[in-house]
Amino acid sequence: MNLMSHMIQRQLGLDPPLTRDLVIERDLPVPMPDGTVLLADRWAPRAGGDKLPVALMRSPYGRGALITAGMVRPLAERGFQVILQSARGTFGSGGAFEPMRNEREDGLATLEWVVKQPWFGDSIVLVGPSYLGYVQWAVADRLPPEVKAMIPQVTDSALTLDFLRADAYSLETPFGWGVMIAGQERRLGMLRGLLEERKTRRAMSTLPLGEADVTAIGRHSGYIQDILQHDADDPYWAAIDHRSRVADVSVPVSSVGGWYDIFLPGQLRDFAVLQQAGRNARLTVGPWTHLSMDGTMMREALEFGLACARGAEPPPRGPVRLYVMGEEAWRDFESWPPPGYSPRPFYLGSEGTLAVEPPAADPPSGSPAAGQPADLAPDRYRYDPADPTPAIGGVRMVRSGAGRVDNTPLEARPDVLTYTTAPLESDVEVVGEVSAQIWFRSSLPDADVFVRLCDVDADGKSWNVCDGLTSLSAADQVTAATVRLWPTAHRFKAGHRIRVQVSSGSFPRYARNPGTGEPRATAASLLAADQSVYHDPGHPSAITLPVRSPGAEGTEDAS
């Protein structure tokens, strides 16, 4: 057994392999309809490998030690033969790599090739995370009968588009990915790319932003220029958007995601579409970032994928399995979003308070401030894009500093407002979609509103749960900014406090708003802005949480 793979498999907690003796056929030519030849490797048990179910992975990241040790070898040692193919224009495959644009045609042609091979039996399972999951959606509505299941992990059917929303432009992930892809075929390219995150971050501070790729890699990148110049609703992206195919999937689908994953909203959208269409689908969401998955992903490929490939039923469980943070336990539900959770607003108030009662002109009778006039003045802060509010934890595709972290240092900044409840008398469980409406005004027309939900523990540490950002183009007038936060499943325990942060950025996760109204790719100057957050009876700023009702489903411990 490969030593690196052995160490990874132990860390993932996988069952012992069925065999350690594998045969590897490298650089198998796979012809495409246009004459381009893609290369693939086949991994299979030396004894009895022919006719086993095929796990098909199509990847732009090569066929080297990192991907084979962590994904290919574990499957090939436990009941699959694995085909790992390099996407067009990458790692020996012919043609030019145009991110996401050729995956439908190439994927369908590859499936046709697999079923014609002498070692093929009767079943294929599509499996893989991120880009390797996206390519599954690209062919999902035209699968041949030999495909028995899909297991897309930390991915969605439109991949890039959620980052490029005009009202919430997420810079770090697509830019960082573009930089990584541009240099990955250098010696140790992917590893070097991960280690050069600091250089990439500095590049994202370049003005104008359209020159940031030159700062990072020494030349312009077609993909990076595309993400800077085309918003999500631009027809330019139509060919990479496979959301319309999701409802037409005919095979069982098991989706695996993370609460701090970059693709979570789209992945949950895809799952909801499958459920609404009556498809055989199940969902698993854990406390992970994009780069911090545990063995759940591989176990799902083995338990669910092999069962479907053999015509058997996977081990029984609920259609939706969620890790409820705070409780730190797995729970099963029947659907997403689960029933039994009702929207409850928590209102921002004066002196940094957060409460279920809306703001009133005078404090309620019986309160310590009864009989005194309420402080209804807006809270103010100054946002300077030259010293932007930093991204701390949360939804980021970085090696460290993502996911749940203590936000106390961030909340000490003068450009971050916080609103906090009193210590909770009982647990508050939140599962589902989270949104906020913040009454806001800026000294400039163009401004951003970033909202983060946190859990403040008994020691006073503030742990981020979920967050989101929206961009405004008429912010110099008092306006209700609607912010869509990441979905979540979290239990705020008795004695803890619920906190809401409000600021105007999270850089470099989201691009800086220069305040000038110029296009993001060409803006060459930065303007500081004075921001106001209102919380009076006429402007009731609030975050709305899906709070569990008494007797709601999902009480079964799935651990």
Indicate where each model-derived feature is located.
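Conserved alpha/beta-hydrolase "acid-adjacent" motif
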Residues: 262-268
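Short beta-strand/loop motif that positions the catalytic acidic residue
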Residues: 249, 255-257
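Cap/lid segment of the alpha/beta-hydrolase catalytic domain
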Residues: 45-116, 164, 171, 413, ...
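A catalytic-pocket lid/entrance helix-loop region that shapes and gates access to the active site
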Residues: 127, 134-198, 259-262, 277-308
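A short loop-to-beta-strand scaffold at the N-terminal edge of the catalytic core in hydrolase folds
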Residues: 33-45
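Mobile cap/lid helix-loop segments that gate and shape the active-site cleft of serine hydrolases
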Residues: 209-245, 251, 262
